[in-house]
Regions:
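Long lumenal/extracellular ectodomains of secretory and single-pass membrane proteins
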Residues: 1-318, 328-495
């Protein structure tokens, strides 16, 4: 009876009435499946989800936290990490102290500043001071320095809280405000941060040596103030003569400024892109890291109305950018194709010579309506049944990128979309392709499957790095999570 009660109590419905689950039956897996999709959620909601995971298994929860922040091997989620780290410092400070020295390694030095005013403040300031002294010593010997000075707050900043933090740090370092400021100036000069050049209107720097975020963030300043040299650099990037760093950029960052539902033509969904912007976008997109797959996999992209609800980033931007990226980098038989769905599914073959051409083309198919994922499964099954397609020619895997607020099943509203699709395929002599449910906006606590379902995994976030993780990963939700966080990269992270 207890198991029946648990099963019944775990039932809920999506915003569109589809039967689904409140939880995967693991709080850690619930967090893993959504931690990359919480950017629009409140601090309190983020904390509540982490508290449950931390209570279930502290070590797993801590590894999940650092995986979420990891800008090189994980999801690159900054705000969620800082919210949780601040909560931990106030409630479980020992878990923070054990991992303080790893924060900058997985993220940035300024992530540590969220610990100001917490029981971990003193230890955090000591970590900063130790690195600061190492950098000053290295500077005296004309050596390399860390990026600490780039991220430390300035005492002459315009924001009052930033100034207060800077003064507190200077005091802990044993420096006057003036000495602290001079030290930062010297260290930042050694780092050669591009902001110094822009402030002084000095455009003699080497574009090929600038970090990816800065290159994209300041592209309009380059166009405006150094158009000839910047244009020449972009041409050399396109011919392979120069390298443009884009290793920490996510595809949505190139799509987000230009994709629009409100304020654009309903037929295009695109804002105007200038000729100079086109050159910059095309070169940057071509320079993104390549996460390829050789499997017969196809991405399924949700373009329903809720994907355009106000959020930063817009879920539709994330989904469309990932769909376009994956289709281009897919080396299987579905290369340059993906399925877009809302009221009905559309198989889209990507056309266009450049990124801007291709983005504009695929955006023109957007149908901002309901969330009929059942029709996607029906399209694949009908195509197979009517043409006697053997199992091995079906997609081996479907990567469904969505906010998971699916419509209810038309023929059996009491079944979840996953179970309904599974039953339909089996009734016609087929096995349902493996499914990756990729959440890009977790507004509600609900999950499409539970932890021990076979042939399915749950992921979340904006990074294409997940494509390579799910290619050869264990196709069981809980086992896949463990496979990711038990990687050697997170071995040293403990509670």
């Amino acid at each position: 009876m207890l198991n029946y009660l648990k099963k019944e109590a775990n039932k809920t419905v999506t915003e569109n009435g589809a039967v689904t689950h409140i939880t995967t039956e693991s709080d850690c897996l619930d967090l893993f499946a959504t931690i990359g999709a919480l950017r629009r959620e409140s601090d309190q909601e983020i904390e509540a989800r982490f508290i449950r995971a931390y209570t279930e298994n502290r070590d797993i929860a801590m590894k999940l936290l650092f995986f979420a922040r990891d800008i090189r091997g994980g999801l690159g989620e900054r705000r969620v990490f800082k919210v949780i780290l601040n909560w931990l410092a106030k409630n479980e400070p020992q878990s923070v102290r054990k991992n303080l020295t790893y924060v900058a390694e997985y993220g940035r030095f300024d992530d540590l500043l969220c610990l100001m005013g917490t029981p971990c403040e003193k230890e955090m300031l000591s970590v900063l001071k130790e690195q600061f002294e190492k950098d000053r010593l290295s500077l005296e010997n004309s050596g390399e320095v860390s990026l600490l000075a780039k991220w430390l707050p300035s005492v002459n900043a315009s924001n009052a809280q930033t100034v207060r933090n800077a003064k507190k740090i200077a005091k802990h370092f044993g420096l006057s405000d003036a000495s602290y400021r001079k030290a930062l100036v010297a260290l930042r000069r050694q780092i050669r941060i591009i902001e110094n050049n822009l402030r002084e209107k000095d455009y003699t720097f080497d574009y090929s040596k600038q970090p990816s975020k800065a290159m994209y963030k300041y592209r309009k300043a380059f166009m405006r103030n150094d158009s000839e040299r910047y244009g020449d650099f972009l041409k050399k990037v396109s011919t392979g003569e120069e390298k443009l760093h884009a290793d920490t950029l996510a595809p949505y960052e190139l799509v987000e400024p230009y994709l629009s539902y409100h304020g654009s033509s309903d037929s295009t969904f695109m804002r105007k892109i200038t000729e100079q912007e086109k050159d910059s976008l095309n070169a940057t997109w071509a320079s993104l890291p390549k996460f390829e797959t050789k499997e017969n996999v196809i991405a399924v992209i949700d373009t329903s109305g809720s994907m355009y609800w106000d959020a930063k980033p817009l879920p539709a931007s994330v989904a469309l950018s990932l769909g376009l990226y994956f289709a281009e980098n897919n080396t299987g038989i579905y290369k340059n194709h993906f399925i877009e769905f809302s009221r009905k599914p559309q198989l889209i073959e990507i056309k266009g010579e450049t990124f801007v051409d291709r983005l504009r083309y695929v955006a023109s198919f957007n149908e901002v309506a309901n969330t009929n994922i059942e029709a996607v499964f029906d399209l694949i099954l009908k195509s197979a049944v009517e043409n006697n397609v053997p199992q091995e020619e079906l997609p081996a895997k479907l990567i469904i990128i969505s906010d998971m607020e699916f419509d209810c099943c038309v023929e059996n509203a009491k079944m979840s979309n996953f179970n309904n699709a599974k039953a339909k395929f089996e009734a016609n002599g087929y096995k349902l392709p493996e499914i990756v449910f990729w959440n890009v906006a977790s507004r509600n606590r609900q999950q499409p499957v539970t932890k021990n379902e076979q042939g399915v995994v749950l992921v979340s976030g904006c990074t294409p790095r997940l494509f390579s993780m799910v290619e050869s990963g264990n196709m069981n939700p809980y086992a896949f999570m463990l496979e990711v966080i038990e990687n050697e990269r997170y071995a040293k992270i403990v509670a």
